[in-house]
UniProtKB/Swiss-Prot annotation:
Its main location: cytoplasm. Its cofactor is FAD. This is tRNA uridine 5-carboxymethylaminomethyl modification enzyme MnmG. GO terms for biological process: tRNA methylation; tRNA wobble uridine modification. Homodimer. Heterotetramer of two MnmE and two MnmG subunits.
Length: 653
């Protein structure tokens, strides 16, 4: 019987990888009307949380709010599957407030799979993609194609391990830790993308054959222990404190299930001694592995080596679900051999008799340095090829989801022949992250941080809808129902702000003495509620207590009005800085400027600016390693020099 090639399926967009980036990318493209296929190695592990089963935290929660404001799904799934919610940094300013939810990892995965299966235009395929089909392959293969806009080739589809070819005009790679994945326990290793799942073959070589540079990164996850074997009654309990708060701006999706507590223990002298005696058995300290791991999520051995002066480290015991006894030992990832891990766990108070269900392990994997991407997350070498998530060198479900949405959006717009969307740094943490990724030569897993943004007071979680939902509606990501909800909320917010600016409280009013005591300042005659809120220590909750704010008013409206009023001066100044930086983009820089002596610039920026010698701010902003914070510092320095020069010339006269 003569051989016949299998029929080729055609899609508009193909997404490779079913993690948090891949799911957001596929859902976004499908909702924009594109026929979309999502390929994954295991349909039973869709949107899996292989490390910490949690969503949110500092800067990460802002990302989740932003993804939701643009129509993404990570926020509402985190809300629906939350086991516990807490507000972090609550004692600090609103720029760094962060919602964090402990989630039921299996329920989260099931709900995401159901959502994908119910989405029109979206097909799911379980297969290993090992190759890329292109026209104009720089290596000399493929069909002839005339290069355009700097691209050396154009994507036409993907090829699977068993030889099937699927055609598409755009392909989004979201392969996580699976490209060349190798997991390590002590000095033992095996090919795997994560424990129990095979690594992906072929794609790294396919990318390299197209001229892409690849490298290796590392991450790790701690052991899981049986809850029933832990003496929880001996440990500090950490209950939920934010069951009434949500990531999603859509109140019709809010679900508050029964909350579960986490618990806290600490390392001991025995913990530290056992680690110090066996450091050479770990992949990093033993020299078996040299890939860079995440700076902000170090292993327990890294903590003990780097912070040798600390005699104890806090460890959190977090549930993985309502229907499983598995406990995630946060802050205790390790590269020690499995035979030592149980002994190590049993040095922790409350875990003296614990049962280890899964050992800790490290995983190193191939990634694509993101300087090879444009801000749309399309690769510079191959038109129609996009990448997102850990493949771009990031760490975290939230970072992955945000990139997935951007890549899916721009893949869809490419197919439609529409202009690519770039998210400016000053408009969102999404923009901040992507700007960092594509402009900086990063050699360790990237995590979003509030300190990475120069505009964090403006880029808060509570106002993510105000910043991004109008754009989402314009792009077709937000439907009419969500748009109506948004408009109603904004009307209520503006009405409340106006009321607070107009309504006054007199010194003779019954509530005045208590409010004066709260602030330590007298009310002279009368004062508007807005000016009262501007006083330190006064919050909308205090006004509710005295009948000055409607307790039935939505929390988002109450807090939004309070923040806008209380921080109005700071917000105006930060917006002025943003506007000034935009205006200054064409400002010329002196040819003889000595960047080495500008101490407010980062060391990297001083070196890069000296080497390049940009003519203006626009050129300076394109130099990898020169951040927007550096540009702001340079602008301030130039203004100070200008004032000093003017002052000196005036004095001379």
């Amino acid at each position: 019987m003569p051989f016949s090639a299998p029929p080729t399926e055609h899609f508009d967009v193909i997404v490779v990888g079913g993690g948090h980036a891949g799911c957001e990318a596929a859902l976004t493209a499908a909702r924009l009307g594109l026929s979309t296929a999502l390929f994954t190695l295991n349909l039973d592990r869709i949107a899996w949380q292989p490390c910490n089963p949690a969503v949110g935290g500092p800067a990460k929660s802002q990302l989740v709010h932003e993804v939701d404001a643009l129509g993404g799904v990570i926020g509402r799934l985190a809300d629906a599957t939350a086991l516990q919610k807490r507000v972090l940094n609550a004692s600090r300013g609103p720029a760094v407030w962060a919602l964090r939810a402990q989630t039921d990892k299996r329920l989260y995965s099931r709900q995401m799979l159901q959502l994908l299966q119910q989405t029109a235009n979206l097909s799911l395929r379980e297969a290993m993609v090992t190759g890329l089909e292109v026209k104009g392959d720089p290596s000399g293969g493929g069909e002839h194609w005339e290069p355009a806009q700097g691209h050396a080739a154009q994507i036409t589809g993907v090829r699977t391990y068993f030889g099937s070819i699927y055609r598409a005009q755009a392909v989004v790679l979201t392969t996580g830790t699976f490209l060349g994945g190798q997991i390590w326990v002590g000095n033992q290793s095996m090919p795997a993308g994560r424990a129990g799942e095979q690594a992906a073959e072929g794609l790294t070589e396919a990318l390299e054959s197209l001229g892409f540079q690849t490298n290796r990164l590392k991450t790790g996850t701690p052991a899981r222990v049986d809850r029933r074997s832990i003496a929880l009654d001996q440990l500090e309990e950490q209950p939920s404190d934010a069951a009434d708060r949500f990531f999603s701006f859509d109140p019709t999706t809010w679900v508050s299930g029964e909350q579960m507590s986490c618990h806290i223990t600490r390392t001991t002298a025995s913990t530290h001694q056992l680690i110090k005696e066996n450091l050479e058995l770990t992949p990093i300290y033993g020299g078996f592995l040299d890939s860079k791991g995440p700076r902000y999520c170090p292993s327990i051995e890294d903590k003990i080596v780097r912070f040798a002066d600390k005699d104890s480290h806090q460890i959190f015991l977090e549930p993985e679900g309502r229907d499983t006894p598995e406990i995630y030992v946060q802050g205790f990832s390790t590269g020690l051999p499995e035979r030592l891990q149980l002994d190590l766990l049993r040095t922790l108070p409350g875990l003296e008799q614990c049962i280890m269900l899964r050992p800790a392990y490290a995983v190193d994997y191939d990634y694509l340095p993101a300087t090879q991407l444009s801000p749309s997350l399309q690769t510079k070498r191959v038109k129609g090829l996009f990448t997102a998530g850990q493949l771009n060198g990031t760490t975290g479900y939230e970072e992955a989801a945000a990139q997935g949405l951007v890549a899916g959006l721009n893949a869809a717009r490419l197919v439609h022949g529409q202009e690519q969307v770039h998210f400016p740094r000053e408009g969102s943490y999404i923009g901040t992250m992507i700007d960092d990724l594509v402009s900086k030569d990063l050699h360790e897993p990237y995590r979003v941080l509030t300190s990475r943004s120069e505009y964090r007071l403006i880029l808060r979680g509570d106002n993510a809808d105000r910043r991004l939902t109008p754009l989402g509606y314009q792009l077709g990501l937000i439907d009419a129902r969500r748009w109506q909800l948004f408009q109603s909320k904004q009307t209520a917010l503006e009405d409340e702000k106006q009321r607070l600016e107009k309504q006054r409280i007199k010194a003779s009013d019954p509530a005045a003495p208590a409010l004066e005591a709260k602030t330590g300042a007298k009310i002279k005659g009368s004062i508007t509620l807005a000016d009262l809120l501007r006083r330190p220590g006064v919050h909308s909750a205090d006004l509710i207590e005295h009948g000055l704010v409607d307790p039935e008013l939505a929390l988002g409206v109450r807090e939004g009005a309070e923040i806008d009023i209380k921080y109005s001066g700071y917000l105006q100044r930060q917006q002025q800085q943003i506007d000034q930086l935009k205006r200054q983009s064409q400002r010329r820089l002196p040819a003889n400027l000595d960047y080495a002596n500008i101490s407010t610039l980062s060391k990297e920026a001083r070196e890069k600016l000296t080497a390049v010698g940009p003519l203006n701010f626009a050129q300076a902003s394109q130099i990898p390693g020169v951040s927007k914070a550096d540009l702001t510092a340079l602008l301030v320095w130039l203004e100070l020099q200008k004032r000093r020069t003017l002052a000196a010339s005036g004095h001379d006269r």
